[in-house]
Amino acid sequence: MSSSRLIEINPFYSHTLKNERTIYVYLPPSYHSDDRKRYPVLYMQDGQHVFFKDRKGESWDVHLTVDELTAQGRMREIIVVAVSHVEDARIAEYMHANPDGHNIFQTTNQGELYETFLVREVKPFIDETYRTLTEKEHTALMGSSAGGLVSYNIGFRQPETFGMIGALCPFFVSVDPATMEDRWLSAVYTDKKPLKIWMDVGDAEGFTVMEKHVRQVADTLMEAGYKPGGDFMYYFAVGSGHSQKDWAARVHAPLLYFFGEIGTPVRVDLHGPERIGLQGPSCALNPVVHYDSGFMMTDLDADYEVTDPGIVEVTAEGRLLPKREGNVTVRYKRQGLTASLDLTVVPHLSGMVSVTMFVEVPVCTPKTDTLYAGIELPMIGERLYGGTFQVPRGISFEFRISRGLGKHETDASGREIPYRKFTAREGLELSYRVEHWVDVPPDTEAKEAANG
C-alpha cells in the first residue's frame, strides 16, 4: 500500500519579498498511484513546525494527523503546503497595516507583500507543479498566533482564492502587562465573505493571546451573519497553552471541518466560573460539544435553563447577566445533550488579583536581567527573580521558565520537564526552582560549584 510523502522545496525565492525560504509539501498516499486524481490544498504558516520539531521539541505533526484521519475515512485526502517563515522577518510579514498606525514591534509591516507572495507566487507554483483542485472551495489557509492573524487577514482580503480559514490562537492584540493596555494589531472585518472559518483560543495562554479579544472578533463575525456551528466554528480550549503541542492536539478539528465530516454530537462539558459579581468583570459559559468523530467546538447558539432567572440570565452565546445575589444552577440543553453548572452571584468581584512569584535559578545560569515565567520577572537578588504583579482575575498561564527563545528550563540532567501552570482565581503566592537550562551543558553546575 502506498504511503504519504513529504517533499522539500529549498530554496523558494520570492520576487515580492526579496528573500527565500523552505516550503514543505505533503502528498497523500494515493498521489503517485492515481495520476488522474486531483486534491484539495491546505496552506499553512510557520511551515518548519508543521511536520518537524521546533526548539522545544514540539511539532504540529500535521502529516500524522492527516494520515490517520484519511486512513479512517473521516476526511478526504489533501495536499498540505507548509510555508516556512523567515526567522528575522516573521513578525513583519505576518502583520498587515495596524488600524491605529502604531508600529508596535518596531518593524515595517509587510503583510500585504506576504499576501501577494502567497497568492501570486506560492499558489500558482503549487497548482502548476501538483495535481490540485484550484478553486477557492477546495483551498484552505491556516496558522497559529501571528500565523493565525495573517491567515485571518488574507482570508478576508482574498476570499476569491481561499474559501476556508483556520485561525488558531490568532494574535489580534498585544497586551502591555504593566498597564493592561490593549494594542490591536489588525483591522476587524465587519462584512460577511463566502468563507468557512475556524477560530480558537486556549484558556492558559496568559497575556500572549487572551480569550476576550478572540471572542470579540468572534462576536463581530456572528454580527456580520456568520452562523456558529455552520460557516463559523469557535472553540475555547480548556487547559490549552500557546505552543505547537497545543495546536497539534486539536488540528484534527479544523481538518474535519474543512475536508471531512464532523459527525454527531455525543457529549457536552459545561465550563464556567463558580462566582460572578454584580459589579465586576463580564463572564461567559463555555459549553464544549464533543462529536463521535473526535471533533469539538464551543456552542455559541445554545439553550440554557436557570433555576432562578431573577438571579442571573444567560444569553444564547453564553454571556452571564447577573441580576441580584444568590445561588443558581445553570443547565445547558441542546441536541439531546445536557450539562449543569452551579453558580453564585456575589455583590462585587475585583477585575484584578495579585500574584507574587519567586524563581530561584542554579549557579550555572548565564547572566540575565529578566526571566519569563508566564510573567516577565526582574532579578531581585543573587540567583533570585520575582515580584508582585496585578493580573486579570481568572487568567491562566502555561509555561516553562525561560531566559528567552530556546533557553528554557530542564531537569538536572538536561531533559525536558512538563509545563508549569497556574490560574489566578484569587491572589496567589508562587515559588519555583529551576534545576538546569536546555542551552547549558548538564555538567556545568557541578564544575561551577567545584570552582566556588
Show the residue positions of the predicted features.
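Intrinsic N-terminal pre-sequences and regulatory tails
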Residues: 216-223, 234-236, 290-292, 316-317, ...
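Insoluble glucan recognition modules
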Residues: 272, 278-280, 317, 321-327, ...
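Non-catalytic cap/lid and distal C-terminal segments of serine-dependent acyl enzymes
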Residues: 1-269, 283-286, 350-369, 381-386, ...
